[in-house]
């Protein structure tokens, strides 16, 4: 049996890191030979989680084909979000909770995707279905991933399953998930120590929409003014990436995790689909999006529909 690498998407968030750890553990218990790796360094929120549970960071890779022939993907499937040489390896497994786009394989594979708030919730179900015990430390990590993806169960992506899984994992990990969760989310909102490029790269994904490449970055904060006092510099950083990386449109979704409201900063063209998607007019390159916290559920589908209209 050949070794396989397990990894989440580029610019990994907490779920991308934890899901890789959890699914690798699960697969090894099922008899596979896997190693969890990452496509980037952990962000501040994820580092808080790793430190809290005394868990090492994953080894970071930029290529997979020089190590293995096959890989397992978690928390993503779109090739532009994956490892740079994804076309040169066989994808044997995918566990995800996102849309399927631009994904095809030459061989049959294991594919498990569910419309849940977090990939780690899907992986929890695999553990339960196969009677594999979740260790306390791993339960804490998986709990953290769900809190991160669902903004402490407040995001509209949250399902009843996510809520039930959080409560069960909290029991296994012996942790007060509400107190811990708020501290964890706040750990990821320290913006002053980061450059504008770091802010827009930390949690960003690319999407193909009607022939246009749209980059959507999300910045979590406890005060939107902390983001927009740097608007000019953020716009400049986004313009630089549009030019260097071939993005047509760069959207920066600044989200207040305390009151569940967002502001969208729009850099590039076309802007008409953005206005159509949200039924609003862009002013000073910005749109107010009250009640919007989820890129996956409240931004990308609306943009995709508007671009395809």
UniProtKB/Swiss-Prot annotation:
Protein's organism: Lactiplantibacillus plantarum (strain ATCC BAA-793 / NCIMB 8826 / WCFS1)
Family of the protein in this entry: Belongs to the PPase class C family.
The protein's name in its UniProt record: Probable manganese-dependent inorganic pyrophosphatase
Cofactor binding description: Binds 2 manganese ions per subunit.
Any one GO molecular-function label of the UniProt entry: manganese ion binding
Alphabetical list of Pfam families matching this protein: DHH, DHHA2
Primary residence: cytoplasm
Alphabetical list of SMART domains matching this protein: DHHA2
Residues noted as binding Mn(2+) 1 in the record, renumbered to the chain: 9, 13, 75
Cofactor(s) required for function per UniProt: Mn(2+)
Coiled-coil residue spans: none
Upper classification of the organism: Bacteria, Bacillati, Bacillota, Bacilli, Lactobacillales
Catalytic activity: diphosphate + H2O = 2 phosphate + H(+)
PANTHER family noted in UniProt: BNIP - RELATED (PTHR12112), MANGANESE-DEPENDENT INORGANIC PYROPHOSPHATASE-RELATED (PTHR12112:SF22)
Name of the gene: ppaC
Subcellular location per the Swiss-Prot or TrEMBL entry: Cytoplasm
């Amino acid at each position: 049996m050949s070794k396989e690498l397990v990894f989440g998407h580029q610019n990994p968030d907490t779920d991308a890191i934890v899901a890789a750890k959890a699914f690798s553990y699960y697969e090894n218990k099922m008899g596979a030979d896997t190693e969890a790796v990452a496509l980037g360094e952990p962000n501040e929120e994820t580092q808080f989680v790793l430190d809290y549970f005394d868990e090492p960071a994953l080894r970071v890779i930029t290529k997979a084909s020089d190590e293995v022939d096959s890989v397992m993907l978690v928390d993503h499937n779109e090739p532009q979000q994956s490892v740079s040489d994804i076309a040169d390896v066989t994808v044997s497994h995918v566990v995800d909770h996102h849309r399927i786009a631009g994904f095809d394989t030459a061989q049959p594979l294991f594919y498990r995707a569910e419309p849940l708030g977090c990939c780690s919730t899907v992986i929890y179900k695999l553990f339960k279905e196969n009677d594999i015990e979740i260790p306390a430390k791993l339960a804490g990590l998986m709990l953290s991933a769900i809190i991160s993806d669902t903004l402490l169960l407040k995001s509209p992506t949250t399902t009843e399953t996510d809520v039930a899984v959080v409560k069960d994992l909290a029991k296994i990990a012996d942790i007060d998930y509400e107190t811990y969760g708020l501290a964890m989310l706040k750990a990821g909102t320290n913006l002053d120590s980061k450059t504008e490029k770091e802010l827009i790269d930390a949690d960003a994904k690319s999407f193909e929409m009607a022939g246009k490449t749209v980059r959507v970055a999300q910045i979590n904060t406890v005060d939107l003014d902390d983001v927009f006092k740097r608007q000019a510099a953020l716009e400049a950083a986004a313009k630089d990436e549009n030019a260097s990386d071939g993005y047509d449109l760069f959207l920066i979704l600044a989200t207040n995790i305390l009151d569940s409201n967002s502001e969208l900063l729009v850099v590039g063209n076309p802007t008409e689909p953005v206005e159509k998607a949200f039924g609003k007019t862009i002013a000073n390159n910005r749109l107010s999006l009250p009640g919007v916290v989820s890129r996956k559920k409240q931004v990308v589908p609306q943009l995709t529909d508007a671009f395809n209209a």
